[in-house]
């Protein structure tokens, strides 16, 4: 199924960015071969040097876009330090892209606990065993840590580590991009002065 067959209406006429994103993500779930919720997450360190990596979007609504991670990882430390981040979704099958950026907040403990319980048991063990973004002596050292935590939590529920939780990006800018012939692409950006502000829509030159 082509992008044109999936598209209904002119997205540049939309005035609701979260609703438009939901529609595009739903279409990506049909056309993408795997992980339609994969997104490039950009952060910056204390020197202003950027870092980018792929993560998985685990939820979104009018409050923002949520993902989960180890707060002691590089991205965790950078977000806690700068309290800002950016994301870029790129769906090749649809020839579409969505970029967003804004301040970041930590999700509630209740949200983090609820999501953590949905993860595979092995993934919950991994959250304890992996000292993410730190030097690893060998694969054996990681597997040993996994075995130790597997034994520790052999019975009962596996608690969520205090250093593992979620972030919510509350965008002040969301841009929708769609490929067109001769690189004359369609671009629409929604902007607001703060996460509580009203959206303004601007059509952009490609």
Swiss-Prot record:
Catalytic activity: pyridoxamine 5'-phosphate + O2 + H2O = pyridoxal 5'-phosphate + H2O2 + NH4(+); pyridoxine 5'-phosphate + O2 = pyridoxal 5'-phosphate + H2O2
Cofactor: how and how many bound: Binds 1 FMN per subunit.
An annotated Gene Ontology molecular function: FMN binding
Subunit and partners: Homodimer.
Pathway: Cofactor metabolism; pyridoxal 5'-phosphate salvage; pyridoxal 5'-phosphate from pyridoxamine 5'-phosphate: step 1/1; Cofactor metabolism; pyridoxal 5'-phosphate salvage; pyridoxal 5'-phosphate from pyridoxine 5'-phosphate: step 1/1
Annotated positions binding substrate: 58, 115, 119, 123, 183-185
Known role: Catalyzes the oxidation of either pyridoxine 5'-phosphate (PNP) or pyridoxamine 5'-phosphate (PMP) into pyridoxal 5'-phosphate (PLP).
Reported cofactor(s): FMN
Gene Ontology BP, a term: pyridoxine biosynthetic process
Gene: pdxH
The EC number(s) this enzyme carries: 1.4.3.5
Key word Calcium present: no
Taxonomic lineage of the native organism: Bacteria, Pseudomonadati, Pseudomonadota, Alphaproteobacteria, Hyphomicrobiales
Full protein name: Pyridoxine/pyridoxamine 5'-phosphate oxidase
Classification via InterPro entries: Pyridox_Oxase, Pyridox_Oxase_N, Pyridoxamine_oxidase_dimer_C, Split_barrel_FMN-bd
Keywords (A to Z) from UniProt: Flavoprotein, FMN, Oxidoreductase, Pyridoxine biosynthesis
Broad enzyme group: oxidoreductase
Listed SUPFAM superfamilies: FMN-binding split barrel
Keyword Lipoprotein found: no
Family: Belongs to the pyridoxamine 5'-phosphate oxidase family.
Binding of FMN, residues: 53-58, 68-69, 75, 97, 132-133, 177, 187
């Amino acid at each position: 199924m082509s992008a044109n067959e999936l598209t209904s209406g002119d997205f540049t006429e939309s005035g609701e960015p979260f609703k438009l994103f939901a529609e595009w993500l739903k279409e990506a779930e049909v056309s993408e071969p795997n992980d339609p919720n994969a997104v490039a997450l950009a952060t910056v360190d204390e020197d202003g040097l950027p870092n980018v990596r792929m993560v998985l979007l685990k939820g979104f609504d009018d409050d923002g876009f949520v993902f989960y991670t180890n707060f002691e990882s590089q991205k965790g430390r950078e977000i806690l330090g700068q309290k800002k981040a950016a994301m870029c979704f790129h769906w090749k099958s649809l020839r579409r892209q969505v970029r967003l950026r804004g301040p970041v907040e930590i999700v509630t403990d209740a949200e983090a606990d609820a999501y953590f319980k949905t993860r595979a048991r092995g993934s919950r063990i991994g959250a304890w065993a992996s000292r993410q973004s730190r030097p690893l002596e060998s694969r054996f050292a990681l597997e040993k840590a996994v075995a130790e935590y597997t034994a520790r939590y052999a019975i009962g529920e596996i608690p969520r580590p205090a250093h593992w939780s979620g972030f919510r990006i509350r965008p002040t800018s969301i841009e929708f991009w769609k490929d067109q012939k001769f690189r004359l692409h369609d671009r629409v950006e929604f902007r607001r002065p703060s996460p509580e502000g009203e959206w303004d829509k601007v059509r952009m030159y490609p």
